[in-house]
Regions:
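Short hydrophobic-aromatic micro-motifs
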Residues: 75-79, 119
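C-terminal subregion of chymotrypsin/trypsin-like serine protease catalytic domains
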Residues: 24-36, 71-76, 168-169, 188, ...
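Chymotrypsin/trypsin-fold serine protease catalytic domain
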Residues: 112-186, 212-238
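A conserved glycine-rich beta-strand in the N-terminal activation segment of trypsin-fold
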Residues: 52-73, 193
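Classical Sec-dependent N-terminal signal peptides that target proteins to the secretory pathway
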Residues: 2-25
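Conserved catalytic-core segment of clan PA serine endopeptidases
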Residues: 27-49, 60-63, 84-127, 131-139, ...
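Short, surface-exposed secondary-structure boundary micro-motifs
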Residues: 79-81, 152, 201
Length: 250
């Protein structure tokens, strides 16, 4: 048998033996490598359409001035300090611009004790359902419950991760404010007027309007929101007054 035939025969026998034995080409062993744990992200970037009931207050330059939360077809809550002596031009919900009819603050001309205000629009917001509100924060939420913020700090929309904020409670002489403890993340400029939310028996509901953070020795130690349930009577009164005004102009 010629040399070439012997080589071909040997190769064919190896192929047959490999098929019969079910073996395959051995791969080079890979060394075990320690996989780094996933990095904790305190906030999740959102599209403008996600949680569409949280919108933004915009300057004439289209830059974000603050945040706002839709609670009725044409009315939104925000922080009063975003409305007083500001250059707010329009409101944006789910990427759509809406003209402002007028604004009103609980504490006229000031926000020192009651940093909450309402923004009334010239038309209803389209394609966005207003968010529900918790009517009894103290009776519903327990200390250390997870709470979620949604706002427009740093110019884009974001929601806090599940474990970023815990509900701490309400302090004496500041009963209209909710204190939440930040974990490796904090609200920031631009989040003001946005929402603090809690997931309860009625689903995802608004409990507060974001207003401030406090620093101690260079570190942010707590974040504050205005309790919406403390202002239910005022909110309902202003909404009814707006409906009456609109009915008179029709």
């Amino acid at each position: 048998m010629s040399k070439n035939k012997l080589v071909a025969y040997a190769v064919s026998m190896l192929v047959v033996m490999n098929q019969l034995s079910g073996c395959s080409t051995l791969e080079k062993p890979v060394e075990n490598k320690t996989v780094a744990p996933p990095q904790f992200e305190p906030f999740i970037r959102l599209s403008d359409e996600a949680f569409g009931f949280v919108g933004s207050l915009r300057r004439p330059t289209d830059r974000v001035l603050g945040s706002t939360v839709l609670i009725g077809s044409n009315v939104a809550l925000t922080a009063a300090h975003c409305l007083i002596d500001s250059d707010i031009s329009y409101v944006e919900f789910a990427g759509n611009k809406y003209e402002i009819d007028y604004t009103v603050c609980y504490e006229v001309g000031s926000y020192r004790n009651h940093d909450i205000g309402l923004v009334f629009l010239t038309q209803d917001v389209i394609g966005v359902d207003p968010v529900g509100r918790v009517d009894d924060v103290l009776g519903s939420i327990k200390k250390w419950d997870y709470v979620t913020t949604i706002g427009y700090s740093r110019g884009f929309k974001k929601a806090s991760s599940l474990s970023t904020f815990r509900y701490y409670g309400v302090l004496y002489n500041e009963e209209n404010q909710i204190k939440m403890l930040p974990n490796r993340g904090s609200i920031w400029f631009g989040d003001s007027g946005g929402g603090l939310f809690w997931f309860g028996d009625n689903g995802f509901e608004l409990i507060g309007i974001i207003v401030s953070f406090s620093k101690m020795e260079g570190f942010i130690v707590e974040n504050s929101s205005i309790r919406v349930d403390c202002y239910e009577g005022w909110i309902d009164y202003e909404i009814e007054k707006n409906k009456l005004l609109n009915s008179q102009t029709e």
